[in-house]
Regions:
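Extracellular receptor-binding modules and their adjoining Ser/Thr/Gly/Asp/Asn-rich linkers
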Residues: 1-33, 58, 62, 66-89
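Short, exposed beta-strand/loop patches in secreted or surface proteins that constitute
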Residues: 51-56
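Short structured motifs
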Residues: 47-50, 67
Length: 89
């Protein structure tokens, strides 16, 4: 088995105008591995949707998104990749 692997996550978010929303996305971690770091996040390249925070845990990532557009942003696809490392035994 490889020492390092990855898993992907995907969700759709809606954020009211001028609001911040934490979006928690769960991902699967194969047995014997643990989350190491976030490799990338893509928010459909929306220019008015900056990321305010990222918290990664055992099997989920919480991403804080701020809507600066002045209107509700709907159905923005949020995808990313988490790097996993094999646990030492």
């Amino acid at each position: 088995a490889s020492i390092i692997t990855y898993t992907n996550f995907r969700t759709t978010v809606n954020i009211p105008a001028d609001m911040e929303r934490d979006t928690v996305v769960e991902f699967s971690v194969p047995s014997g591995y643990e989350a190491l770091c976030l490799r990338n996040i893509d928010t459909s390249i929306h220019p008015m949707l900056p990321i305010s925070s990222i918290i990664i845990s055992e099997n989920s990532v919480s991403i804080g998104l701020v809507n600066l557009s002045g209107s509700t942003i709907t159905d923005i696809e949020l995808t990313g990749t988490v790097i996993l490392i094999r646990k030492l035994t």
